[in-house]
UniProtKB/Swiss-Prot annotation:
Keywords: Glycolysis, Lyase, Metal-binding, Zinc. The active site is at 86 (proton donor). It comes from Coccidioides immitis (strain RS). The keyword Lyase applies. This is Putative fructose-bisphosphate aldolase. Dihydroxyacetone phosphate binds at residues 193, 224-226, 245-248. It catalyses: beta-D-fructose 1,6-bisphosphate = D-glyceraldehyde 3-phosphate + dihydroxyacetone phosphate. GO terms for biological process: glycolytic process. CDD domains: TBP_aldolase_IIB.
Amino acid sequence: MPHPSLKSNRALPLLTFARTHSFAIPAICVYNLEGILAIIRAAEHKRSPAMILLFPWAIQYADSLLVRTAASACRAASVPITLHLDHAQDPEIIKRAADLSRSETHEPGFDSIMVDMSHFSKEENLRLTRELVAYCNARGIATEAEPGRIEGGEDGVQDTVDLEGVLTTPEESEEFVATGINWLAPAFGNVHGNYGPRGVQLDYERLQRINEAVGERVGLVLHGADPFTKEIFEKCIERGVAKVNVNRAVNNEYVKVMREKAGSLPITRLHEEVTNAMQAAVEKIMDMIDSTGKAEFMMDEK
């Protein structure tokens, strides 16, 4: 049962609706205004719900500026879009981010925060997660956590590649659900960053067992999904995944356009082309995880 302060949370209904209608919410990591615009425009064009994901770097780099901009854009959109802080690994940053969203300020902030203590021991991970979940919940913010370690490197995430990889078990999932989280990001062969020469090797049976154990109580989140095919997404959604995090598949388009066209176009045109390329990548993801067109159904059910 969600914390009483979460009754008006904007993000929780998205995953609940996605799970019950067999699709996933596209959750796109971005670092700048172009990325924010690309997600909003893609969601409105595809009539898809979505999440904008910022890393703690956004707060360290620009204080509340990017957060307020993204949060305001989410609330002004014609489809359901929410703002999520991804891979928040410093307790003080988590509290700072949560305080940006306090209702008494009358300014929008994060709708959800990933409390990522996976770089600590399991016991410390659980203790800190429980403490920080309570802090976020009291401010009306939904939470996500990551049992085990989803190895690899990703821009904005502390590298765990040298740590022993740990896959999530149903028993660990139960322990994390007990901390009060709303969403769980299990490790079942998915990794942040590059998958290496063997390619994608997912343990679907493990994901199914986790879903059977806790899927009725928390939403399941897929990390490390950048190279996945539509078939892989379908298998994950069949096993309970309701939110798909994507980073490089979208942000690589920014880098590609900048490398190819910087210096040959006016700056205004360059920013437009970057945004258009990122938007096209987001729309492709929406089609692959079947969120296209679902916003209308969500709004009809409200």
